[in-house]
C-alpha cells in the first residue's frame, strides 16, 4: 500500500549578497519547513495506538510487508545532519568549509569600526553567557552532555573586552538585540528543549565557521591583525565540533519526529536574533 512521501521545503531569496550574509548565519531569510502528513504519521503524532491493547501501527507500508521509504532529508545520518540540511538551504555547502567562503571578496568591502565591533562583542558575550549558564544550571537531561564542551566563548570574550579596555576604549553596555536574544533563550530553555537545542547548535556552529572568517577580516582591517580570544579554542576545533555533534545526535534519538521537526523549524528565529547583533559590524 502506498503512502505519501514526506518532503522538506525551504523558500528563500537567491541573491548573492543575501547568500553571503546568511552564510555566516546572520541574515534572517524566511525559511519554511513543511512535512506532508501521512496516515501513519500525522503532524502531531509520530505513531498512533491501534487499539486498547497498545498495539502500535507505525507505518502502513511496513504493515503491508513493504520496505518503508526514507522520509526526512539526512535522517539516516543523524539529527545534526538534518539541522545542517536546513542551514545549507540558506548557505551552500561549498561556502561552509573551515571558515572559508567564496564570499570573502564581498566581506572585504565592509567598513568595520571599533565602536560597532565592540557592540557586537558585548552582545555576543551576553548571549554566550546566557547559553552557558542555562546549560550549567539546568536539570534538564538533554543539556547534561553539553556542559564543558570546549566551545564555550563567554570567558574568552571577557578577556577580549578587557584587552580593548586596556587599549583605552570604552566598553559599551549590552544593547537591545543582545538582551532580547538572551531573554528569549531563558524563556524557552526549560519549557522547550528542542527549540533551545536549535539555538545552541546554530550559535556555536555558525561562529566556528563563518564567525571565524569575519573575525579574520575585522582583525586585518582595524586591529592590526590582532587575533582575539573569541576565535581561539583549546584543542582541535574539528574534534570539539564532532564530539558535540555526537552528543546532539544522542539527545535527538529520544525525541519524537514532531519534536525534531519543531527543532528544525526554530532555525529561522535563530537567524533573525543573531542578525540583529551582527548588524553592529556593518554600522
Swiss-Prot record:
Pfam families referenced in this protein's UniProt entry, alphabetically: Heme_oxygenase
What's one GO-annotated cellular component?
chloroplast
Please describe what happens when the gene is knocked out.
No visible phenotype under normal growth conditions.
Q: Does the keyword DNA damage apply?
A: no
Q: Which UniProt keywords apply?
A: Chloroplast, Heme, Iron, Metal-binding, Oxidoreductase, Photosynthesis, Plastid, Transit peptide
This protein's major location comes to plastid
Q: What is its EC number?
A: 1.14.14.18
Q: Which reaction does it catalyse?
A: heme b + 3 reduced [NADPH--hemoprotein reductase] + 3 O2 = biliverdin IXalpha + CO + Fe(2+) + 3 oxidized [NADPH--hemoprotein reductase] + 3 H2O + H(+)
What family is this?
A: Belongs to the heme oxygenase family.
Name the UniProt record assigns to this protein:
Heme oxygenase 4, chloroplastic
Q: Say which species the protein is native to.
A: Arabidopsis thaliana (Mouse-ear cress)
Write the lineage as a comma-separated list. Eukaryota, Viridiplantae, Streptophyta, Embryophyta, Tracheophyta
